[in-house]
């Protein structure tokens, strides 16, 4: 895994207080979003969909900051489609 992707996943762990043990399985932005949404609790009365949207927004900000990626689809793969090296 690239240092940039490691940095991104570390920032996700820090931001959400989650442990990402099997990073190889999280090969798309959508997989990261789903993992975080499933392992964290919704706050402030959010339902599941609102919680996932909230997580997606933060993950998008972290991707922009650590990877320089600002436009993506959730099913795009980090290495092959987004060219994260």
Residue ranges and their predicted role:
Residues 1-85:
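Phosphopantetheine-dependent thiolation modules in NRPS/PKS and related acyl-activating systems
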């Amino acid at each position: 895994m690239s240092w940039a992707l490691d940095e991104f996943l570390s920032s996700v762990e820090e931001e959400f207080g989650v442990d990402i043990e099997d990073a190889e399985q999280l090969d798309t932005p959508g997989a990261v979003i789903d993992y975080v949404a499933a392992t964290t609790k919704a706050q402030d009365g959010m339902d599941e969909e609102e919680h996932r949207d909230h997580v997606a927004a933060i993950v998008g900000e972290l991707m922009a900051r650590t990877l320089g990626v600002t436009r993506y689809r959730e099913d795009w793969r980090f290495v092959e489609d987004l060219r994260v090296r």
